[in-house]
Amino acid sequence: MRTIRIGSGAGYSGDRIEPAVELAEKGNINYLVFECLAERTIAIAQNAKLNDPTKGYDPLLVERFEAVLPICKKNGIKIITNMGAANPQAGAAKVREIAARLGLGKLKIAAISGDDVVEALKVSDTKILETGAPASSMASVLVSANAYVGAAPMVEALANGADVIITGRVADPSMFLAPQIHEFGWSQDDWDKIGKGTAVGHLLECGGQVTGGYYAEPGKKDVADLARLGFPIAEVSEDGAIVITKVEGSGGKVTEHTCKEQILYEVHDPKTYLTPDVTADFSQITFTEVAPNRIQVGGVTGRARTDTLKVSVGYNDGYMGEGQISYAGPGALARGQLALEIVKERLKITGVKANELRFDLIGVNSIHADVLAPAPEPTEVRVRVTGRCDSMKEAVRIGNEVETLYTNGPASGGGATKSAKQVVAMLSALFPRDKVVPVIEYLEA
């Protein structure tokens, strides 16, 4: 029975590049998938495209493709990625340019768009899930609205001979599912097989998480050679049999436990994992070690997909200003607490208008606030003050006040930093599937 091998080349936009090179060189893979598009990333990319119509794709696209494209071309590996972000056409054009510059010969590149529904949402009565308000009520602040497209357009592109597929917003598991459907000729309403293929995608989509990265905890869950963490590979057979593994000799490990942690990642209901392709059921999933770093996956089923697609909605939510400064040595905690009180009072005196303010001592209460039992007094703390404002001018003033602690006390502050930036916040909606029409464009290198 025929088997294919799919490698995960990235788990987020800024991920390491050398594990993908290792997969292409030593992984004996047929497909290399780069998942680089977090929820907020595409809204940021949309802003970049508005400022420059030739931008809006992933900032590391060029560096990644320069590293892996020659190897993939040589070894006959197809590449699928959502690094197109807000501008798949520009991303595909850049890949064509790289291929030509490197003299790689003939290459067919597919750019998949159609996920951008922001203009439709601006005049839509579609409800925002978190607020219940109609999307049209946010028209003036909307930055982006992208539907999670499924595997179908990628399957079509592969059938038409694409060597590289550059997409915008697609569901993460769908990029791994598409080659399985294409290679094995699975019907896209064979729900159990589509469910199995989706489980493959969910296990691989975060890259090194399933090979022990996110799993590692010294003394409890030790993982060797994390500095050389290998990224995962799925071996998938035509009948849906699955083995998760990694490049032999690479760092990290693939075990029942790493797979169990990853299958639960971002899953609210294991019995009803909704994707554009299927309603997958992970509730009876099994993981069995068949050899070191080789985990067999079973028990996954699927049901019919929904009539709606999730839309990730990005909107302008003001401006965030931040300032930080450190105190060390005896009395560091007391000086840090005094610094916070001074800044709090200064913001009142100077009339800074902030919708939200937060005052933290990093290393003391910035994560758990005051819910944990008191720890021994630290000998170093870092003050952090941040606030969300309606204007950049007001946001800048927050960091400025923290910086003035340098000379205005308390004693011995150092390492002050400040920043101010626009806030792009995220909401979600459900949009009719039949109103989202993917578009495929082909470029020849």
Regions inferred by a protein language model and the residue ranges of each:
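Active-site glycine-rich loop that binds ribose-phosphate moieties when present
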Residues: 144-158
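Gly-rich Lys/Arg/Thr-decorated short loops/hinges at beta-loop-alpha junctions or inter-strand turns
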Residues: 1-3, 39-55, 73, 117-141
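C-terminal non-catalytic interaction/assembly regions of soluble proteins
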Residues: 298-445
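N-terminal glycine-rich anion-binding loops that anchor highly charged ligand groups
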Residues: 27-45
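Flexible, glycine/charged-enriched surface loops at secondary-structure junctions
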Residues: 105-109, 210-222, 270-289, 345-362, ...
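N-terminal amphipathic/basic leader segments beginning at the initiator methionine
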Residues: 1-24
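Catalytic or ion-translocation cores adjacent to nucleophile or general acid/base/metal-coordination motifs
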Residues: 100-117, 177-218
